Amino acid sequence: MAGVGIDDIAIYFPKLYFDMKDFAEFRGADFGKLNKGLGLTAMAIPDAHEDTATMGANACARLIDRNQLDPRKIGRIYLGTESALDGAKPTATYIMDMLEQRYDDTYGKECFRNCDVVDLTFACIGAVDAMHNTLDWVARGGDEQDRIGIVVFAD
């Protein structure tokens, strides 16, 4: 079995922030518990044009660019989320569509043709399951296959 692991992590945070003092006041929550107990001072919130898919696509693009990955060699993009956009279609398909638009001039249309995309939706465990599943998939490829999988955690 091939040695597998996490090669890199890319993070995308929205640019808008909500002050936790304001949040606590608005929600009638104890700011001390949020600030001292959880260490929170602000919370990132998506802009009007941002959602789970755009944030996931931004993080994926950073990862692909930084590691000079060929999208044609990426075999899967698995998304762990609590915030699905569509009741029937996986949000990961929207991420893949945005990535195809970004890379089609360089790698050709449908450069993610052989990429499997799935959402795993179950609170925080969905992302952990996506990671374990992808690590197992890479390991099962053996040393002769150079499998590349991307796991996205987005909410």
Predicted regions and their residues:
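Conserved catalytic cysteine-centered active-site region
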Residues: K33-D51, A84-R147
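Conserved "HGTGT" condensation-loop signature of ketosynthase/thiolase-family condensing enzymes
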Residues: M1-Y78, M96-D104
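Short glycine-rich anion-binding loops that position phosphate/pyrophosphate groups of nucleotides
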Residues: Y12, E82-A84, D155
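Short, flexible loop/turn elements at secondary-structure junctions
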Residues: A10, T121-C124, F153-D155
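Long, acidic, intrinsically disordered low-complexity segments
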Residues: G75-S83, G87
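Short beta-strand segments
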Residues: G80, D146-D155
